[in-house]
Amino acid sequence: ERLKATPANLNGLLDALGERQAVLVGNDWGASIAWQAAQVRPDRFRAVAALGVPMMGRAPMAPSRLFPQNEQAWFYTHYFSAPGVAEAEFERDIPATLRKIYFCASGAMGPRDGGTPNPFGMVPRGGGLLDSLTDPTALPPWLGAADLERSVQAYTRSGFRGGLNYYRNLDGNWQAQAAFAGLRIEVPALYLVGEYDTGLAIPGMRQIIDAMPLLAPDLRGSQVIARAGHWLQQEAPDAVNAALVAFLRAL
């Protein structure tokens, strides 16, 4: 149950470093882990900042039942959960896979509406996630060719299965969340999200963000970074750093 193990690992890291407390900053999956760690060990993690993924309560049902699917299409989490399916698609042409996902989840795609290509939306049955995504003619300014090549080499060595296995344990993590029911984030918190983040296209996500003070009563800010997408700290590093530094100085 990674939901329990990873915060425990962070606690162990503090012990190994000889530190009594730390401030956590997490992005995407790391944001979920940072929220969880601050929730269960506020004595060790005295503040938390999260990028992209807001603090949210436990869903009323398991993700496999919650996320949409029908005869024509299924939500990307279902597609990722099918063993071997996404791996086969993504590993067929790793450079193209990364170009498409990085570009189409970025702020370059503009506002997230029903017609915006989204790597993290509905996937046609019998088709692939990459089919509808734009392959850019040039890399966005925040993604250098050398950086992309390092990612290509890393995924060529490892494949995509390790990351995709996260989605295959969503129901397990949901079950583990029951142990933390009723716990709030009692330490100071900060939330940052890109104006064009793909997650904002998920139904109900904006309402979840608006309701965060109920779960994190010491939320010091919920900031939307203009024109940035899912890769927030890469697309808008100056804005992210400024927000983090201001948050840390006020603790």
Regions found by a protein language model. Give the residues of each.
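Flexible "cap/lid" subdomain of the alpha/beta-hydrolase fold that forms the substrate-access gate
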Residues: 1-25, 29-220
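Catalytic active-site module of serine/aspartate enzymes centered on a nucleophile-bearing elbow/loop
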Residues: 217-251
